[in-house]
Amino acid sequence: MTSVAEGLFKSLPKPKYTGEDEEVPQHAQPRGPRIVGADQIDQSQIVLRRTGPPPYGNRAGWRPRAAEDFGDGGAFPEILVAQYPLDMGRKGTATTSNALAVQVDAEGKVKYDAIARRGHSENRIVHASFKDLIPLRQRVDMGEISLDRPSEEEVQAQMEKTKNALASLVEGAVAAQKPKNVKGGRRAEPTFVRYTPANQMGDTTRKNDRIMKIVERQQDPMEPPKFKHKKIPRGPPSPPPPIMHSPPRKLTAEDQEAWRIPPPVSNWKNPKGYTVPLDKRLAADGRGLQDVTINDKFAQFAEALFTADRHAREEVRLRAQMQQKLAEKEKAQKEEHLRALAQKAREERAASNRRDSRARSHTRSASRSPSAYSRSATPSDDEEAARERERIRRERRQDAERQLRQSRMGTERRIQMMAREQNRDISEKVALGLAKPTQTSESMWDSRLFNQTSGLQSGFNEDNPYDKPLFAAQDAINSIYRPRAQLDVDDEEGAEGEMSKIQKTNRFEVLGKAKEGFRGAAEAEARDGPVQFEKDTTDPFGIDSMIADVTGGAGQKRYGIQEVEREDRGSKRARVDDD
């Protein structure tokens, strides 16, 4: 069976594609590192490539050439050849790296100012050390700096350099003001070209040379541009040189508050309609930044006012004490005086009683004598005093009645008084509601407005420009109460009758009556007279009346003005005679 199979395979032709050289599809290719056994290394001829410098002891004759030879480090100082790690310092190659080569000065110190000088020219002055902060006069190497006067050549060179720099600035400023899109501003100079024509169409004759003048074509300055030029954005400028500062200090709360800038808030515009708090609005106003200085005169003025007030209060207190002492002293003197008057009055009363008793005894003895006593009718002064008191009483009664009538005077009576007074103002009539305007249509306008002949043009009543009275108050004046002429003033019954008649008439219904009065006014007791007030008296304690009673009275008490009839005041002699 095996021999049959082998014979069958041998009889078949050799396959054209064995699959060894065919490319494996992408999805079937192995991924990741290829693992090769130790027995397959020699068959596959794999070469291991090493990067970086060889280890120490194996560097004899080795020279770093590529960037991989340096690894992650720099140049090798033991190899005395030109080395360019990261292609730094190599001329003719454009580097894109921002790394700087470490440079040292004569003393072997690293020159850190190379970072600040990067991107600037060699003539640029860059201050990058502490020595640059010290003034020239205070430096240690002051003697090394040359302060000699420059030569003429140096002055001329510097002046020419300055002049060129200023000229370039001026030209740039002038060119910036000139229009850039105006064509035909400057025309180039014409160009002359020598032209020798070639042989054409088999013509072998000699041709003369021609000199051609090439002139730039005239352009229309008002022609719009044909192409749109787009400016390329400018690249970032060179970094500015570092500025040396003092070491940073931690800000205090006062410094932070001083550097806090409030947001600007306008007092006039608020297009968004925000509700800004009042403290934020005041903070943006800047009032807190101003130092408020209060004049010391305010404190002095307040202190002066306080002192003056205290002094015035002290004076008032002392004055009140003095017045109280004076009042007490005066009261004591008055009591002493009253006591003396009372003692004197008692003594006089006792003396008068003794004198009356003696006179009474003498009269009784005289009446018993046979001689008749003829009584003389002498005019008495008491009758005159009685008539005078009656007249005063009558006048007072008339004044009281007049005041009563005036207090109960109605509106009509007041109009009568106003009519009697010629110079009375019309505003009082208007306030009383009695100056009623006329309701006729003729008095509603002025006749002069209608070109009537009764106006001022006719010459009638030139002093009075109005033809009708302003108010017609004659009806109210005619209804005024007028007392009768034959009424006697002293007639009390007639006066009382007229008073009762006036009281019964409803004189206030003419002007209208209030619908509702004050609360509690209906329950009040009706008043039969005018409102009476207590009059202020100069002698509230009755001391003066007491003195008058003591000094003027004969021991009898009288209240008010009391009339004593003449019959009751007869002398005791007459009563004795009657008996």
Swiss-Prot record:
Biased composition (Basic and acidic residues): 343-359, 386-414, 521-538, 563-579
Any one GO cellular component localisation term in the record: Prp19 complex
UniProtKB keywords: mRNA processing, mRNA splicing, Nucleus, Spliceosome
Low complexity: compositionally biased ranges: 366-379
Region (Disordered): 1-64, 218-254, 343-414, 521-579
Pfam families per the UniProt record, alphabetical: SKIP_SNW
Biological processes annotated in GO: mRNA splicing, via spliceosome
Keyword Translocase recorded: no
GO function term, MF aspect, one: molecular adaptor activity
Family membership noted in the UniProt record: Belongs to the SNW family.
Subunit structure: Associated with the spliceosome.
Role, per record: Involved in pre-mRNA splicing.
Name of protein: Pre-mRNA-processing protein 45
Naturally occurring in which organism (per UniProt): Aspergillus fumigatus (strain ATCC MYA-4609 / CBS 101355 / FGSC A1100 / Af293)
Lineage, uppermost ranks: Eukaryota, Fungi, Dikarya, Ascomycota, Pezizomycotina
